[in-house]
């Protein structure tokens, strides 16, 4: 059986992991064994949190809309129900942005919803 020399491929594989671990603290950024584990764990966190990010942002938008609607004497749940009844098809992301950056337009929507609900 012929001898296999892996100097180039092994170095390339190690370099890829060490480069991915750049900026990590302690031995995690320069010891291959430890860096490999750290990079794997970082990938797991990244995978998990790409899914969690969607939940977190939705919760943030709901909290912002709730705060803005309460300024106009209405709760979030009543407001969202009124939006559906008034057939206003704006998603939570847009409503949240309007509540912060375009208060008059948001107030107009709230008044329109109040008229529909009442």
Curated annotation (Swiss-Prot):
Function: Binds directly to 23S ribosomal RNA and is necessary for the in vitro assembly process of the 50S ribosomal subunit. It is not involved in the protein synthesizing functions of that subunit.
PANTHER family assigned to the protein according to its UniProt record, in alphabetical order: 39S RIBOSOMAL PROTEIN L20 (PTHR10986)
Gene name linked to the record: rplT
Recorded family membership: Belongs to the bacterial ribosomal protein bL20 family.
Cystine residue pairs: none
A Gene Ontology biological process term: ribosomal large subunit assembly
Gene3D superfamilies assigned: 6.10.160.10, Ribosomal protein L20
UniProt keywords, alphabetically: Ribonucleoprotein, Ribosomal protein, RNA-binding, rRNA-binding
Stored Pfam families: Ribosomal_L20
Entry GO terms, CC: ribonucleoprotein complex; ribosome
GO molecular function annotations of the record: rRNA binding; structural constituent of ribosome
Origin organism lineage: Bacteria, Pseudomonadati, Pseudomonadota, Betaproteobacteria, Burkholderiales
Source organism (scientific name): Cupriavidus necator (strain ATCC 17699 / DSM 428 / KCTC 22496 / NCIMB 10442 / H16 / Stanier 337) (Ralstonia eutropha)
Designated name of the protein: Large ribosomal subunit protein bL20
InterPro entries (alphabetical): Ribosomal_bL20, RIBOSOMAL_L20_CS, Ribosomal_protein_bL20_C
Cleavable signal peptide: none
């Amino acid at each position: 059986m012929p001898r296999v020399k892996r100097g180039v491929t092994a170095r390339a594989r190690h370099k890829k992991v060490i480069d991915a671990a750049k900026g990590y603290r302690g031995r995690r950024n320069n010891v291959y064994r430890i860096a490999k584990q750290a990079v794997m764990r970082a990938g797991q966190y990244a995978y998990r949190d790409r899914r969690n990010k969607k939940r977190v942002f939705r919760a943030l938008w709901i909290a912002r809309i709730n705060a803005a609607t309460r300024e106009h004497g209405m709760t979030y749940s009543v407001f969202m129900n009124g939006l559906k009844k008034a057939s206003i098809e704006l998603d939570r992301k847009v409503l949240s942005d309007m509540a912060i950056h375009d208060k008059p337009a948001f107030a107009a929507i709230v008044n329109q919803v109040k008229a529909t609900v009442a």
